[in-house]
């Protein structure tokens, strides 16, 4: 991993919550210090491009076989599988909205629901460390800054009620790393 930043305290978020957040720039399939990673999947859950394809390739064919048994996933929801050849225990698959021009309020609600669904699924499965990729920003065309703001606000809101999970925002691109740094200063 190239860079790691631990967030500072802000006025609106307690120091305790900020200590549960960090960002990493690098390949999500190589993160070794989390129990689960989040896959920005398509509705079929059968692999695709971007991070979805990378996770499927790194996990091996068993992931695809297990995903077939899940019969897809609705936009804004999440499902869990084993991680197989990945260095974590689980993969949480979530399907973000596809944005045509600029995101609608429904798109924003669905993206927030992706983060909420993953956090709830992690809590239900006693997952204490979770890494999120950037959901919907690649092939699904959600604007990076808006998506990051929704991600950070949703996760901070969840952590204000559930302080028993640590969250990593894993980003691959330098511009996303800068965006997350700006949002959490």
Report each predicted region and the residues it spans.
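Phosphate/ribose-phosphate-bearing ligand recognition and processing surfaces
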Residues: 99-185
